[in-house]
Amino acid sequence: MSSLLVKKLVESATTPMRGSEGAAGYDISSVEDVVVPAMGRIAVSTGISIRVPNGTYGRIAPRSGLAYKYGIDVLAGVIDSDYRGELKAILYNTTERDYIIKKGDRIAQLILEQIVTPDVAVVLELEDTARGGGGFGSTGI
């Protein structure tokens, strides 16, 4: 399967669309009027369910304009290939003012990413590297 399959759960739902030929993501829209409370979060309905192409998963990502102009971010959103429920976007308002979303507003973007799911092998040792166990800024800031 090479197509992104979309099922409209609500007649007024908007089909995900790319904003330009080179756009990485498909804009997804709200099917409801909601308020993202100041410094709060809410799961916003899109009125669609999807089936991603084989070998991929969907990632719900912020729209740069909403993030830059209004401080609206998107929290965790991984859409597994076997998930068939409604696609929702968890929006987080980083500002001190409520943000109003109207039905039909583009709220996030769906990015399809290839995924590798190798078998897990338990080993007694891992090979050494120059970095070793250094993390959290160990290679510089």
Curated annotation (Swiss-Prot):
Domain of life, per lineage: Viruses
Annotated GO MF terms: dUTP diphosphatase activity; magnesium ion binding
Gene Ontology terms: biological process: dUMP biosynthetic process; dUTP catabolic process
Pathway: Pyrimidine metabolism; dUMP biosynthesis; dUMP from dCTP (dUTP route): step 2/2
Record's keyword terms, sorted: Hydrolase, Magnesium, Metal-binding, Nucleotide metabolism
Cofactor (UniProt): Mg(2+)
Enzyme class, UniProt record, top EC level: hydrolase
Catalytic activity: dUTP + H2O = dUMP + diphosphate + H(+)
Keyword field contains Translocase: no
UniProt xrefs under InterPro entries: dUTPase, dUTPase-like, dUTPase-like_sf, dUTPase_trimeric
Cross-referenced Pfam families: dUTPase
Enzyme Commission code(s) on record: 3.6.1.23
Signal peptide: none
Similarity field: Belongs to the dUTPase family.
PANTHER family reported for this sequence: DEOXYURIDINE 5'-TRIPHOSPHATE NUCLEOTIDOHYDROLASE
Function (record text): This enzyme is involved in nucleotide metabolism: it produces dUMP, the immediate precursor of thymidine nucleotides and it decreases the intracellular concentration of dUTP so that uracil cannot be incorporated into DNA.
Identification of the protein by name: Deoxyuridine 5'-triphosphate nucleotidohydrolase
